[in-house]
């Protein structure tokens, strides 16, 4: 009899929870319409995989890319709408969040074509790869719009779990297995420290989890200057540091880059930084409003270490993957300048502008490396010597992307850095901007060193990889070259037409 009553209570409770969830989705589903499109795409991929045959594999790419493009379109139609908080305060929709979601979707859309040929050649499971990419994209999008501590913790875990699996996707490769394990351990440590900081915020604010309510709770409890807030600040900064991978939290980055598939590295190197930057901006700006001087100091230290160590260590690398890993550490140092400047001097607008250019520069570089790696099987920088003599288009594309990463005019990277540094200078961050300028000059050195190798015509310097270089006849090359061409153009042209881009970025401010 007791068991029967308990069973009835369980059914009633489950039904009540389901009805509440259905009610929330029914009345708030339109606010997450771009995310719902990706969820529909995931379901469609699973259904199609269970009924399709091997020859239908191109449809998987089509479904994934179409869902991403439709999701981008839905975001664009929602642009400039009034900010809305939905799902009982758990999710916020505004221009600032949507621009970061757009950057993540754009990166995912451009990354999928990079994986086509490699997966076809190795006969790896295509459905699982695309499912992980779409799920990681979904997690990143929810993180950008998260408005409470629980969602801010769960959403990046959705992203991270897929990233752990993607980093170890080539299960027979020992380096890939090692990269996946190292990434899992470091990511788990970062998440644990992050949630520890959240617990201090939750307790100090009187049990509040929404970002704005945490500020009100700290005022009501008079705990905004307590030691607990200092512990929360340190824990959250360290936890976010593992996600953004600035120095000194960068140790896992080169090893994971080197051991993982190139197209995953291209995807992860940007989406993780975009999502974590959006999350860091909201947490630090709102929940830790009363400790702004302290977190400014912490971020300044991280930015200086990242710009110096990232660019210095990149000079010594012989692997293209590891060089780009250390380069990305330096790049996140520049992005942190925009976070520190904040809303007052167009800091967020400069950060968004630079991230948009960084997507094209970085993805263009990775597209070139993917093509070269597929045709030669090597990742060594020395083996790029003389590539211009065999494939001028690929060599010039790689050179343009590297020069844009270095920040040489009139390419997009120059104008992105110029705007970022100018905003930092206007905000009084003279020392930080000076370090950024010096390290940018330093980065040009190792980028030019690679370009010099590309353009050399001396036979004694050309390795057998380039001497025996052949273009692949596979039709899927077109998709990689298309992504590469789009990224090269985007790394070059926007420098000439900055005003519309700046206007869009400034529209996103709070």
From Swiss-Prot:
Assembly and oligomerization: NDH is composed of at least 16 different subunits, 5 of which are encoded in the nucleus.
Membrane topology of the entry: Multi-pass membrane protein
BP GO terms, sorted: ATP synthesis coupled electron transport; photosynthesis, light reaction
Location of this chain's protein in the cell: Plastid, Chloroplast thylakoid membrane
Enzyme Commission number(s): 7.1.1.-
Naturally occurring in which organism (per UniProt): Triticum aestivum
Alphabetically ordered keywords of this record: Chloroplast, Membrane, NAD, NADP, Plastid, Plastoquinone, Quinone, Thylakoid, Translocase, Transmembrane, Transmembrane helix, Transport
Location (main, coarse): plastid
Superkingdom, taxonomy of origin: Eukaryota
Pfam family for this entry, one: Ndh2_N
Membrane spanning residue stretches: 24-44, 59-79, 99-119, 124-144, 149-169, 183-203, 229-249, 295-315, 323-343, 354-374, 395-415, 418-438
HAMAP family: NDH1_NuoN_1
Enzyme class: translocase
Catalyzed reactions: a plastoquinone + NADH + (n+1) H(+)(in) = a plastoquinol + NAD(+) + n H(+)(out); a plastoquinone + NADPH + (n+1) H(+)(in) = a plastoquinol + NADP(+) + n H(+)(out)
Stated role: NDH shuttles electrons from NAD(P)H:plastoquinone, via FMN and iron-sulfur (Fe-S) centers, to quinones in the photosynthetic chain and possibly in a chloroplast respiratory chain. The immediate electron acceptor for the enzyme in this species is believed to be plastoquinone. Couples the redox reaction to proton translocation, and thus conserves the redox energy in a proton gradient.
Listed GO CC annotations: chloroplast thylakoid membrane
Protein name from the UniProt record: NAD(P)H-quinone oxidoreductase subunit 2 A, chloroplastic
GO molecular function: NADH dehydrogenase (ubiquinone) activity; quinone binding
Xref: InterPro entries: NADH-Q_OxRdtase_suN/2, ND/Mrp_TM, Ndh2_N
NCBIfam families reported for this sequence: NDH_I_N (TIGR01770)
Protein family membership: Belongs to the complex I subunit 2 family.
């Amino acid at each position: 009899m007791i068991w029967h009553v308990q069973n009835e209570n369980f059914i009633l409770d489950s039904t009540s929870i389901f009805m509440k969830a259905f009610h929330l989705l029914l009345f708030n589903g339109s606010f997450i319409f771009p995310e719902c499109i990706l969820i529909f795409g995931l379901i469609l991929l699973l259904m199609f995989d269970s009924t399709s045959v091997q020859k239908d594999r191109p449809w998987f790419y089509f479904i994934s890319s179409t869902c991403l493009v439709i999701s981008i379109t839905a975001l664009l139609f929602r642009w400039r709408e009034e900010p809305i908080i939905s799902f009982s305060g758990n999710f916020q929709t505004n221009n600032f969040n949507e621009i970061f979601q757009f950057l993540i979707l754009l990166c995912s859309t451009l990354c999928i074509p990079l994986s086509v040929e490699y997966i076809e050649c190795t006969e790896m499971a295509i459905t699982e790869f695309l499912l992980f990419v779409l799920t990681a994209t979904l997690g990143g999008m929810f993180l950008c719009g998260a408005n409470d501590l629980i969602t801010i913790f769960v959403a990046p875990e959705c992203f991270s779990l897929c990233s752990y699996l993607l980093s170890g996707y080539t299960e027979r490769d020992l380096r890939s297995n090692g990269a996946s394990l190292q990434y899992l351990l470091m990511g788990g440590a970062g998440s644990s420290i992050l949630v520890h900081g959240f617990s201090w915020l939750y307790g100090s604010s009187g049990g509040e989890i929404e970002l704005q309510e945490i500020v009100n709770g700290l005022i009501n409890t008079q705990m905004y200057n307590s030691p607990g807030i200092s512990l929360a600040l340190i824990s959250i900064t360290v936890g976010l540091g593992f996600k953004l991978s600035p120095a000194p939290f960068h140790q896992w980055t080169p090893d994971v880059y080197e051991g993982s598939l190139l197209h995953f590295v291209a995807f992860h190197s940007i989406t993780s930084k975009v999502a974590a930057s959006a999350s860091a901006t909201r947490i630090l700006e709102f929940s830790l409003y009363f400790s702004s001087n302290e977190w400014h100091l912490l971020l300044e230290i991280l930015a200086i270490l990242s710009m110096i160590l990232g660019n210095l260590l990149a000079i010594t690398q012989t692997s293209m993957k590891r060089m780009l890993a250390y380069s990305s550490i330096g790049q996140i140092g520049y992005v942190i300048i925009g976070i520190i400047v904040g809303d007052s001097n167009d800091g967020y607008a400069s950060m968004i502008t630079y991230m948009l250019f960084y997507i094209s520069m970085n993805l263009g570089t990775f597209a070139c490396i993917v093509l070269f790696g597929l045709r030669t099987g090597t990742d060594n920088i020395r083996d790029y010597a003389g590539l211009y003599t065999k494939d001028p288009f690929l060599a010039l594309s790689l050179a343009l992307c590297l020069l844009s990463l270095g920040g040489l005019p009139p390419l997009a990277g120059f104008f992105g850095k110029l705007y970022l540094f100018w905003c930092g200078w206007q905000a009084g961050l003279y020392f930080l901007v000076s370090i950024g300028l010096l390290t940018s000059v330093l980065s040009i050195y190792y980028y030019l060193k690679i370009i010099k190798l590309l353009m050399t015509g001396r036979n004694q310097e050309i390795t057998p990889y380039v001497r025996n270089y052949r273009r692949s006849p596979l039709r899927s090359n077109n998709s990689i070259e298309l992504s590469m061409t789009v990224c090269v153009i985007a790394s070059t042209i926007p420098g000439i037409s900055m005003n519309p881009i700046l206007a869009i970025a400034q529209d996103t401010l709070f």
